[in-house]
């Protein structure tokens, strides 16, 4: 029972911090993880529910590009790589790292090229 009260306190504290500043202290401690978990669903939502697309892309191309960005973010998380691509083999560190780096590089290539197009 006591742990529930303590958990409720910390959860409320994080919510107040996010309301005041837009982020909680715990978000900063693990910034890359917070970014992945926040941006991936946003990009997936945008790929399925956008109003318009940039003039240099067709609707299908823009949707595919947004999905590719979201997929790259998904595979920048080592747990997703291990569970989904490496069949749960936690000992394949080098391969996991290479997959994560490849997705990192591709994500930031797409993200930097289309940063100002991420609107709806």
Enumerate the language-model features and the residues they cover.
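Long, non-globular targeting/processing and low-complexity regions
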Residues: 1-120
